[in-house]
Amino acid sequence: MLNETYRGMLAHKSVIRETFMYGKQRAAQIGYENVFDYSLGNPSVPCPERFTAAMQELLTQEDPVALHGYCPSQGDPEFRTAVAAHLNRTFGLPYAQKDIFPTTGAAGAIAHALRAVTRPGDEVLTFAPYFPEYGPYVEGTGAHLRVVPPQAPAFQPNLEAFEQMLTEKVTCVLINTPNNPTGVVYSADTLTRLAEILTEKSRAYGHNIFLVSDEPYRDIAFDGRAVPYPAAFYPHTLTCFSFSKSLSLPGERLGYVAVRPGCEGEEVLVDMMAQLSRFTGHNCPPSIIQRAVSRCLDVTSDLSVYETNMNLLYNKLKALGFEVERPGGTFYLFPKALEEDANAFCRRAREFDLLLVPSDTFGVTGYVRLAYCIDTEKVKRSLPALEKLAAAYQ
């Protein structure tokens, strides 16, 4: 007999993935160069040469039996030590090897962090708009996701509503900065006030409220902006990171959870997540990727391409009369649709072979997301299609 719970999930397929697959089918019909696919956040720049060199060194200079052997459940020691040292250099916090747990990307990091700090029946708060997989990640723990309504058009967290919704049942808050889908970077003032609220409520309820911070876009910031590090503002923070974007390694699926020094349970959380990983059949990410990435932590891919693409699209959208905020980072724009129904707007956009994602997917209505992690020349070639789309609403 099939598991009806998981069978029921088939009715909730990813709009992003479906749009991406439509783009592939359409490209087969009219040519790849004629389809302007802004659906999927798949990096479009190559990984750093240092990563390639590190892989070559490992494959040619290391003992193959040791290289391809199992690593400890808590992860490769070289990787964990290197990540801790990198975080200390970057953010001035005293992380140690024991605070780092490697995972299969940020998705694995979030899933393990949530399982470690929630119990069935607990509540987890997040801010709209939010990455749609947060729902299954939270529900998979037996907890319940509650969504703080958005604060448009700037989309900084709605802290007034958040404070009202932060009841005694909430054991964890899940944030994402720089944010997918808006590109918003949470300001230092926002994080300071968020930390104050969490501290006040933790004291009032007699238990610490954990902060799980989803940060795969940390290294993609614009206009020389520094991205504030949430763990620097609140001690009970589990930081979830991925190398998919910063090193352009999405297919390698490597990320980590960093347990902030001084966090409640710091001495056991990594061991807990290692056990969770074993018992749910995930285990560690490939050890060779951990070791290669450990030698590349101070470099990134050429991320400047995304700022170039953002400027091209942002300026064109503004010139065409779209309501859109300038993003602080990521590779997403989040303009207001030219009609109330974002799904209908995206269907109209397909008439011009523009593939956009409706904001309903992210928990808000009336907006669309453009993932501009595509070739810059293709961005330029898409601008006339945007003009035609805007003209269709005049």
Label the model's feature ranges.
Residues M1-I16, A27-L59, Q74, E78, ...:
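PLP-dependent class I/II
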Residues Q61-D63:
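N-terminal alpha-helical segment of soluble enzymes
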